[in-house]
From Swiss-Prot:
A Pfam family per the record: DUF16
Gene3D superfamilies: 6.10.250.40
Organism field: Mycoplasma pneumoniae (strain ATCC 29342 / M129 / Subtype 1) (Mycoplasmoides pneumoniae)
Name used for this protein in its record: UPF0134 protein MPN_127
Highest rank taxon of the organism: Bacteria
Family: Belongs to the UPF0134 family.
InterPro entries listed in its UniProt record: DUF16
Amino acid sequence: MFKLKINNFQLGFKLVQWPVTNHLLKHFYVFPINNKGGLAIKRIISLALFKKRLNKDKINNCHVWEEELPDGSYDMGFNGNFNHMEKRKSGYVTQKQFSEFKDANNQRLIKIETTLAIQGEQINKLTQTVEKQGEQINQLVQVVLLQGASKLENFKWSKKHKDKSLMPAWIVWKIFWWKV
């Protein structure tokens, strides 16, 4: 039994390492729950009650206690050698199994993120290539329009003036700007 005096409260408590049995141990001890003088009464409970409260399995030797709070509710604490169980849709799994499952999912998500990042970079490169090709196509279209306009005016000029001379450059520019 340890005795401790805090804020004019004399506290006594006893920690018991119990074997895994189904009988109820009734060792009470008191701990302060805040710095305003509030107290919580803790008692050691049996493993059966602990299993009933948590609805878990596979608990070995451990320290387990129940804390009765001033509002009438309770809080439970434990430490020692046991496998804490997490409930999932498929049933109960140990903390180790859950962490392995979580690590596997994290690795899978990291692979997906890296492939998405690589594909995003590839898409950016392809968009830049498409933009460059679009600019080249626009330049080629302008060249084709200029050549087509000059041939058309040369044809009209040669019919009108009955000679095969080339049309003046200012007429080509005038036709080009008029069509654009």
